[in-house]
Each structure stands twice: as C-alpha cells, then as structure tokens.
Amino acid sequence: MPANQRKQTSQSSYLQTPRNTATPSTQDAGKSVIAPKSSTSDSSETFLTMAQTTTKSNGQLPTPSANINGVPPTVNRKKQKRRAKQAARAAAEQAQGSQTNGGPSPGDVKKQMQELEARFRETGLDEQYDDDEQLDPAEDNAYYSDEEGDAYSGSYGHDGSSTNGYAMPTTNSSSKKQKKKKKSKSSQSDNSNYAHHGPNGSSHNHVSLPIPLQSPPNMQRGPGISKEKIWNTSSQEERERIKEFWLSLGEDERKSLVKVEKDAVLKKMKEQQKHSCSCTVCGRKRTAIEEELEVLYDAYYEELEQYANHQGGDGPPPMMPPPRRFGAMSGLQPPNRLPPVFTGQQPSRGRIVEQLGDDEDEEGDEEYSEDDADEDDYSDEEPEEIPRSHATDFFNFGNSLTVQGGILTVADDLLKNDGKKFIEMMEQLAERRMAREEDAKEQYANANYGHPPNGSMHPHSHGHLHNHPPPPEEDDYDDEEDDEDEYDSQEEDYDEEEMDSMTEEQRMEEGRRMFQIFAARMFEQRVLTAYKEKVAKERQQKLLEELEEESRADSLRKAKKAKDAQKKKEKLLEKKRALAEEKARKEAEKAAEEASLREIEEKKAEEQRLKREENRKKKEAQKKADEEERVRKEAEKQRRLQEQRERQAEQERKQREAKEREKKEKEELRRQALEAKEAKEKEAKERREKHEREKREKEAKVKADKEARELQKREEVAAQQAAVQAAQSAAQASRRPNQVPTPNLSHVLASPHISVAIPAVPKAPTPIKLRTNSQQENHSTIPRTPSGIPQSPFAGMQPMPGGLQPGMPMVPPGFGRPHHDPMFTHQQPIGNQFRPLPIPNGGMPQFQPGFNMHHMPQGRGFPMHGPPGFPQPSPNGMGSIGQLFGAPKEAPPSQAHSRNQSGSFDALSSTTQAQPIARPAPIGRPSSIVHGARHGDKSSNGEPDESSKHLGSSALLDDTDEPLKVGMGPRRSSAAPGNSSRQNFLPPPFGMDRSDPAGMMSSFGTWGAPPNPFGSSSLPGSNGFGGGWNTSLNMNNSFGMPPYFRPSQPRSVAVRLMICMACQNLQSSTPDGWLDIDSIKNEVALLNPPREEPVSERELLDICDTEGNQMNGGGTFEIRHSNGKSQIHYVSDPTPHDFRAVGAPGEIGSPISGNASRNPGPPGRAPIGGF
C-alpha cells in the first residue's frame, strides 16, 4: 500500500473511532516501552504531550504544551476531550504536510504551539489540574513528568530540542477509562516506538530519552510556593533542585555515581556468565564484553562531564555522536521494520513508570494495568510472517526492557529477565568487535556466523556446542478494530536491499546509542536516589530546626508565663505589705490605749494586794500557834506507843526462846532413840544374812547331790520306758488306743507359785547395808517342784520313740525336744516323723508339731527350759503343744491346801508307774510368802494371805496414793477339788489372763525363750521383757510392751525411771550430753504406758530435782536454761552396783532382793534403769 493511502486510512480511522485515538497505530506484539509522562510549567504555561503540532529540523515533532489557568469547565467533559483530540489530529495532519514540504522554521513552531495552547484553553482541557497549577497527586505521583526530566543526564538544550541532532518523535496519548473507578485519566508519553514486526509478529521499539524542557531562570513559581518550603514542593521546583544537585556535585562524586552503576552491571554480567563454558572463544567473548562495557561507560561519563561543564554556554554540547538516523525522513529503514503509519507520528501504548516511592509505585501499577485491560483488545490472529535475518534480533533488546511500576534500566533487565537480552546484545557487540579484529567480513545473513535465527546452538572450531536458551517467545497481538485499517501494510514485501540498508557500523552505533539510553535511564535513578537522600537529610534537618524552634518558643512562652507569675506575686506581696503596715498602725494605737487602762488597773490592784497581805499575816500567826500545840501533843502520844511496843517485844522473845529449847530437847531424844533402833536393826540384819548364807549353802549342796542321784535314776527309767514303748507300738497299731484315765492324785498338781531353782554357788560376801524403808515387803518364795507331771497324751496319738537310732543313748526324763531339732549335735534335724495332729476336743485346727517349741542352740545337748515349776516337754517332743493347745483329758483334782505336797512314791496305777519319776523339788522358802503379793490382796477363798502380815514399803504409802495396776490381771484361782470337767477352749499359758489379749501375745526373747508367763517382772533389776536377754525394745510385741517399771511403784518413781531410760537412749545424740527437754519429753511419752497420764514439762523438771537411789534409777540430773529453753544432763552413778547371785536373798523382811534379777540383761550391758 502506498504511503499516502496508509496515511489516509490512518487518519480516517482516528476520526471515525474516538476510542482508538489513544491507542497506537501499531500494536506491539511483545512488551511495550513505557514512556514517561512529561509535563513542564514555564511561568504559567504547562506543556502537555497530548498532540504534536510542529516538527524539528530532522522531520520529527516536538512536544506541544497547554496552558493551565484553572478555568472551570462549562460543557461536558467527554465532549471537551473529544474536541481536543480532534484538534490534536488536525494539528498532526498539518505537521505531516509541513514535513513533506521541507519542515517549518523555529518561528513557525512557536506560533503553532501558541495556537494550540489557546485552543486548549478554549476547550477547557485543564480540568485535570488543580487550582494552584500543580498536577493532581493521583496523576503526578505515578508517572514521570517533564519536571523530573532535568534529573536525567542532560543531553538536551533549553529549547527542548535534541542536542545530538537525532529526531525525538513523541506519541499522542488520550484519556482512558478504568473498569473499577469509571473515570477517565490522561497519560502522556514522550518516546516514540518504532514497531518492527518480525516473521513471528514480534516488534521492537527504539526508545529515546524524554525531552527535558527547562524553564528560564526567571520562571515564576505558583502562588504560595517558595523555594525554602521543602515540605510541599511542586514537580518543577523538584526538577530544578535535582538539576542543581547534579551540577553542585564535584567531579569525584559524579564519577563515583557512574562507577557504582558500572560495577553493578559488570557484577551482574559476570554472575550471568559464571556457568558458561570455559573455552577460548567464550573467554574472548567475555573479555570483549567487559571491555565494551568499560568503553561505553567511559564514553558516557565523558559526555556527562561535558554536559556539566558546558551547562552555562550558548548551545548544549553534544551528548553522543549523531548516529545514522533511521526513519522515514532519512530514508533508512532497519531490517524487518514496517514503515510508520504517518511520518513522524508514532503513538505508543505504554509509559515509562518511574519508581518515586511505595505509594507511587502502587498507583502507577494499578493505573497501568487497568488502562491496558480497558483499552487494548487483542486478537488471536497472527500477522503474516515476514522472513527476517537473525541479525535483526540485535535490535529486539529494547522490547524486553519494559518494567511496570519501576524504571527502565539495564539493572532492571538484569534482575527481571536475568539479563538475557542485554547479554545477547553485548555478546553480539563483542562478536562484531572480534569479527573486525579477525577481518571476518561476512554478511549478517550468514547462518554459520553468530546465533541462528531460531536456534540456540553455535558450533565452535574446538568441537563442542554451547546450549543457550532461546529468547522468550513474544506473543503476537492485533487490535481487532485496527486490523483492517492500520495493518494492511504488513502484506507488502520488502526488498533485500532495504533489509541490508544498515551497515555494520550503523548497527554498532545504534547499539551503542541504545546502551547509552539505557545507561542514562539507570544513572538517572542513581542521581534521583542521591537527590532523595539529600532531600531527606534536609527535611530531617528542617524538622530538627522546627522542633528546636518549637522548643525555643515553648521555653520563651514558659519564661514569659513565669515572668508574669512573678509580677503577680510581687503585686500580691506589695498588697500584703500595705495591709500589714495598716494593721500594725492600728495595733499600736490599740496597745497605747490598753497600756493606759492597764496602768489604772494596776494601781487598784496594788491597793487591794496590800490589804490582803495584812489579813494574811494575821491568819498565819494564828495558824502557827495552833500547829505548835498539835505537834507537842503528837510527840507525847508517840512516846507512849514506843514504850508499849518495846515491852511486848521483850515478852515475845522470851516465849520463843523457851519453845526452841524444848524443841531441841525433843529432837535430841528422838535422834538417840533412832540411833539405838538402827543399831539394833543392823545387828539383826547381819545375823539374818549370815543365817541365810549358811542355809543357802547347805541347800545347794544337798540339792546338787540329790539332782545327781535323780539324774541317774531318770536315765534308767527312761531306758526302760523306751523299751516298753517300742514293744507296745506294734501291738497298739492294729487296735484303737485306749484312753488311759489319769489318777486323781493330789500331789501331782503344780503349785501356783513359781518354783525358783537355786543352784549351788560359792559363798559371796554380802556388803553391810543400812536398812531402808523401801525394802519392807516380803521376798519371793521358792516353791517346791511337784514330784509328778500329769501325763495326758493326745487323743489319737500313740507315744512312739521317733527319730531314735540304734546306738543312741536314751533321752533322760525332762529333756523333751521338738521333733524338728536334732537329738544330738552330730545328728541332722529329724523330718516330719509325726503325722499331723488331729483336731483337739476344743475344735481348734491342727498345728504342725514343733510349734512354739524351744530350739536347741548349737553345741548343746538339751534345750533351754522354761521357768521351774512348770511341766517340761514330753520325751517325744510334743510337750509344748500339749501344754499350750491341749488340755489334759482328765484334770487331776486340785489341792485343798495351798502348800505344795512333797513328791512321793505312793502306789500308782499301772499307767502312772510307767511314767518317769519327777525330780525332787528344791528346798525353798515357805510358800506363805507369795512372790509379788501386796497388802490387801485376797486369796481365791476370800481369806487374807499370810504375806499380808509382813511389813514393807507399802506401809509408808499415803492413803491417797493408790498403787498402779497397769498390766496386773487377776490371779489364777485354784481349781475346785474334784473338778475334772474339760475346758471348752485352749487354756492360756500359765500366768496369762484369758481376758487380756496382750498377755496372750506378749513379747518373745531372741534366745528362743518362751513367752514370760508372769507378765512384767516386779523386780527392779528386771528389764521388763519376756524371756531371755534381748536388746530390742520392741520385742516383736503386736499389742504393746509391758511397762518398764514396777506397776505398783509410785508415779514419781516410775516417771524418774522413764526419764533415766530416755536420757540413756538419747545420750549418743549429742556430743556434750546436754539434751533438750522437748526431746526427753517425747521419749518419755513413748515409754509411758498407754493408759497413764502423760508427763508434763513442769512435772518432768520437778522430778529431775529429786535425789536418785536404787529404786528410782539413781544418778543425778543437771538442768540449765539457754535461749528460753531448758536442757538436762544425766550423770549416772560413778560405780556400778554389784549383782548378787541368782536366788540370793535380800535384807531381812524385804519383799524384793536387791539386784536379784532373773534376767538382768544381756552380757556386757548394764541393767535398764541403772540397776
């Protein structure tokens, strides 16, 4: 299609469709270059890039301007905009006509611009500006303006023309609709887009710098805006300041800014090529790229310096050498480039958006995206592909440098697109340079050189391939409405000559020019950033100055307020001072009057005082005479009373002396009588002791001889009995054993009193002791052992000699053993040689043989025995079970007399004759002296006991002092004569009450001794435990221990014994022996019987003050008080007491024997309680 036809079609399409007036005539298939919206104000005029009215000398149009007066619109806004667009198109047509005729002069350009401004004022296109001749913030913040153009590198003169003679085509932009806000906004663009449609429909645009129109120095500012006001400045002022800032920088500062930008680009280039191959060709290419960048940046810096140095000259210095101009007027067309729709007019569909801040970026992005979505309609139809050479890809670099919401820089391309386009451009520049060095003058259409058109593989001579990713494919877009009108020219074919019209040098210069454009854009941002930092510092300083001014004004205001307050205070003081003077004057006058009155009153008072003084003297004389008379009478009375008291005291003294003499005489007589009595008692005691010693020696000798004879007899009888039992066992196995009745012999019943065996001991000297009042009770008698033991074999059990082996001696009588103990030390324990016992008549369950029987200590041929006077275990080892759980089948009749009958060999039945002969009872004291009996105890028949006639320590007890009966059960009563009835339940052990569970479950000794059948011993030397020597205080007692003290003792004696025991137990807890009274009290509470009253602290201290003796534990207590607490130290007697032999009698008439304890304690340990 001819050029005039394309021009007519284009114009008609603009006139017919108002919507498309804002769209470019050629739709970009790829990314479009966003040109900045530039607007400037010269005095009261602001140039808007809405239409092109004039052209430069190179045939391209400058930017028109519109005057902004703030005139309110009078007609519809849409109609006004439509008329303005039509006027702009008319002006564009005139401009095209003038270009074909050779171009206008500068005077014609100014004239046309003035006409266009007047026309804009008439149509009211200034409605988008506010009243103070500033752009609306929503419009001005999001885009570049002409005011910001002065911050650029400055390659333009004051008249807005390019300094390098290169044409600066501008685009016409119109208002656009937004989908959300439904209101129109206008955008301006200063860059021209040369649409190069390739075979695949892609296009690329050559971008030129915006035209920075500078205002003259005498430019007037808007009303209310001053240069010093930095908080609210217009874009024109900011542009001027950016320019001044750049010119004010020194050479080193400008060089550092350029160097920073160069280093950033070089660093990114090295990072991009870091992973490429390390061949020589690629290495040379990298080196060439770096050298090319160095050269380009050095040239760019030199041009910047020239611009800065020639800023004040008449004409602007050339920024860069004028390259070959490619365009309609020059007659040169780049390859694969379509001719423009109309000469010099190349609208662009995009804007260069500058990053002025976070809010501005968001506004710019939103407006750009909404405008594009609302304005541009794309079709899926692809234009017919036109074959092109791969060399034309070099000029596609500009198409990829579109950044929405940011600036158009080389750094943006490196960050957003990984620098692929820029790197490809630099690689091609390096290849051209290498080609020139090697004089390889090949054509660009040769496929063997460089990159293939659509591939990414380039072979090298060294035999390896480099895989370069292909450039991103660019979508082909087509405007549906402009498809018929504007793109018919794509069907034309271009000649090969036109494709090759650009020489290599022209392409290289074009590439360098493009790089300088991009470097200017990037450097522009550097300068703007530096300027913003400076402005921020100025604003910060201004803010500090304002704050300081405010603080200064505040301090002045406070000082003024303080000064006013001080003045008020002074006025108040003056007023108070005047009032005080007036008051003082009045008070002086009043005082003078009062003084005169007081003087008159004083005269009257003096007269009255003289009269009163005379009267007083008269009264005093009379009173003195009366007082002297009274004193004389009182002295006389006192003298008489003193004489009477002296006489009475003399009489009392005489009476007292007579009484004292009489008392001394009585005491002397009593002392003499007491000494005589004591001497007499001492003699009697010594005689008794001597007699007792002789008697004991004789008895021991006789007993030893008798025991030897009886032992021999028992051995013979035991041998005979074993032979008889062995013969009868076979005969009784086949028939039921007959119940052998037990003869009712009165002499075989054991005495109710304890029989104490007195062994033969050597005679020991008895120390002479004074008779004490505490030893007045009877001594325990030694009853005689009955001569016979009641035999009652278990029902259903035949006696048989179990566990006897041939050759073993017979067990003598009285040495019964449990079945599980060895008979002799060399014999192993006898197993279960007896079958389980049948249930006794009482209904009790069976117990295994050997329960509760004594064990034999190692190395002893016979077991330990119980106390004398009790039946010994049977020869077959079942004596204990028979005594504990089995009652005799026929109980022997009880004795009518309490005395034990002597053992005799009277006629017995055949069954009794077969039993072993009991050993004779030892010689003991008369049984009338009952062990442990007290005054007032009655026997079972209700008659007073003979022992109650003896005197003892109980005679000294007070009538109110009741003896303690803790643990004392009723005494066992004698069985009635002829009572042979069987008991319904097992009888308790001897000395234990059936009603007292504690007696049944008393403690056991650790030496295998049986439970103590007597309960707690009444002897003070006894440890109070059951059986033998046991160091354990707990003694395995399930129901509590018996009391450690004698139940019949007074409370003071029992408490002192417990205190002594507590101190001995706690002696090792303290190093110095001083014990806290609380710990002693707690220990005494543990020792105190459960039914006794607890010991208080006061009682404990009082009892510690008592003197110790053999009855109450001995020793002494030391008490001290520290920090409000009492501490006690117990000191025992220095010398231990001598222990008498077992059974040795005490003093005559004493109910207890001193130190005659059956179990004084284990060897090596002192008796409990200090005895």
Swiss-Prot record:
Residues 1-238, 307-392, 433-510, 545-739, 863-996, 1139-1171 are annotated as: Disordered. Keywords: Coiled coil, Cytoplasm, Stress response. Residues 87-96, 718-734 have a biased composition (Low complexity). The keyword Repeat does not apply. It is found in: Cytoplasm. Residues 474-733 form a coiled coil. Its main location: cytoplasm. Residues 1-29, 37-68, 160-172, 190-206, 895-915 have a biased composition (Polar residues). It comes from the Eukaryota. Residues 76-86, 176-185 have a biased composition (Basic residues). InterPro entries: Fungal_stress_NST1, NST1. Residues 125-150, 356-384, 472-503 have a biased composition (Acidic residues). Pfam families: NST1 (PF13945). Residues 315-324, 865-874 have a biased composition (Pro residues). Residues 108-124, 226-238, 433-442, 545-717 have a biased composition (Basic and acidic residues). One of its GO terms (cellular component) is cytoplasm. May act as a negative regulator of salt tolerance. Belongs to the NST1 family. This is Stress response protein nst1. It comes from Sclerotinia sclerotiorum (strain ATCC 18683 / 1980 / Ss-1) (White mold).
